């Protein structure tokens, strides 16, 4: 498993403001709740866990109409931004740079933690921050070039047209241009942290890291308290579970008691309704799944432009009766879906890491996903099944293998949960980043 072992040296270290026992960490992130995207959720939990370890954390993020959730020890500063695809990263980056300078004058910063690629700084800006504020650690959350190449792969496998989504179209057309800001980040930061070995390899292949590049690999964790296995002995939880299963028509007697031998298995796919998430490939696999498991039902949860496209495809394939698309839901409902599902399917064509599979494992649900990095850094046959990316027939075979082996699936549920607890929690992440910060400053 990937990760960084915390050094054994003392928590007391020398920084520019003298000897201290806590750090003031400025996190520069284009996403933060109520933007609960992958990066937003990670920064929220990482900031909270760093604060719980005694550090002061200030998050500089984009303005939002809704209120920001509060956490002890975490301050949030909002800056304006231009509401345009890709351009917002530079607009936000400029305002965040100014706000960071102001913050440092009021409350000296010990470490600057940027979340790429959603903040675009120039080489000059990185140099100024390193010289006048604090050392920078840049988290590499995938790359624009990687996103672009993932879209091209999805197009080759007849996923939806990229031009239907303005954000995807902007990445396709301008990803190469905005990659210059990622290049500035890997050149101008004291340290970088890739969110997977695959992402680190992307930067080594498509970008130009300096010869003395310091880049660690730390895979993000998930909230193992929110995403947890089903408790069938808890009356209210069991009633909610039964209601959910019945609403999708996946509620035979075995299913309602959590028996893995159910003949009405519930498949769950979570992810934005965009081409590179592979939902159309999943739909093409469903006729073969239903032929072998006619009682199976598929629920797709995600926002995006493709909802109608997917339902039209389901009707053409004759599987509309077995497919449900949910445009979005609360965290509590999403967590219940993860617990209630028999299998989570994740057919994505590109991820910097991909948190959905870990949320599934934490919930005690096996995962069927693509046999390529970074997914294979987290998922193997001990906790699920793998299939060839873009091959809907192989996807169907993988799902059927999982459903055909209820006893093995029960063991996968246990092993998956334990894997998360052992390696992929926000507690692990806070410890790893704290060690990196200390190494930068010692």
Show the residue positions of the predicted features:
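Membrane-proximal helix-turn-helix segments that form the acceptor-binding/catalytic region
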Residues: 160-192
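A conserved mid-protein helix/loop that constitutes part of the nucleotide-sugar donor-binding site
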Residues: 41, 45, 265-288, 305-311, ...
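Nucleotide-activated donor-binding/catalytic signature segment of Leloir-type glycosyltransferases, i.e.
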Residues: 311-329
